């Protein structure tokens, strides 16, 4: 929850804003959906795995968009009413960053947190679009010790309202390799935890 907590602050995400989360079914993505819902935003989950959509809807998304669909761009514009106020990209591949930037509305903010599949992904953003729409592009990495403490306090205060990290799979050391493989291949919705 600490990283999504930081993203809310860094992105100046406010109640009733239209927010898209790319990689919404992933470990950080699903936590971001929960935080954006807690912040009273209109939330769209974007993912390539439709099997994760039910969990996305259950944990904060109002709508889900299949990033592999031929009409993904139109679906994003429809979901946002013409453009998002903030897009949070946990994938940060060339394709996702360009799709995210294209779906921003005037004054929109793009926050990138992913490693582009382990690569240094480049993406194109038209200078006139950046100027005319007054788009902001921000990187965000990790969270501070203070943000961890603040997010833990928030979870303690809001746990009864569903603001808890979503752990969908646990294992001891004997299943560690299987969990690592499933995380690496995006087969886990939410988080996996090692139980000692």
What do the predicted segments below correspond to?
Residues 109, 124-165:
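Rossmann-fold dehydrogenase core element
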């Amino acid at each position: 929850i600490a990283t999504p907590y930081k993203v809310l602050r860094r992105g100046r995400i406010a109640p009733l804003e239209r927010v898209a989360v790319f990689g919404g079914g992933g470990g950080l993505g699903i936590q971001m959906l929960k935080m954006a819902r807690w912040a009273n935003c209109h939330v769209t989950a974007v993912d390539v795995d439709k099997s994760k959509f039910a969990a996305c809807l259950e944990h904060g998304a109002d709508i889900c968009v299949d990033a592999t669909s031929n009409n993904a761009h139109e679906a994003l514009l429809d979901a946002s009413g013409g453009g998002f106020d903030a897009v949070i990209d946990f994938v940060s591949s060339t394709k996702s960053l360009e799709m995210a930037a294209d779906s921003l509305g005037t004054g929109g903010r793009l926050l990138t947190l992913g490693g582009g599949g382990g690569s240094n992904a480049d993406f194109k953003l038209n200078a006139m679009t950046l100027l005319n729409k007054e788009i902001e592009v921000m990187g965000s990495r990790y969270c501070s010790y203070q943000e961890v403490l603040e997010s833990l306090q928030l979870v303690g205060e809001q746990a009864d309202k569903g603001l808890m990290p979503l752990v969908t799979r646990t294992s001891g050391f004997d299943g560690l390799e299987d969990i690592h493989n499933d995380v690496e291949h995006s087969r886990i919705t939410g988080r996996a935890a090692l139980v000692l």
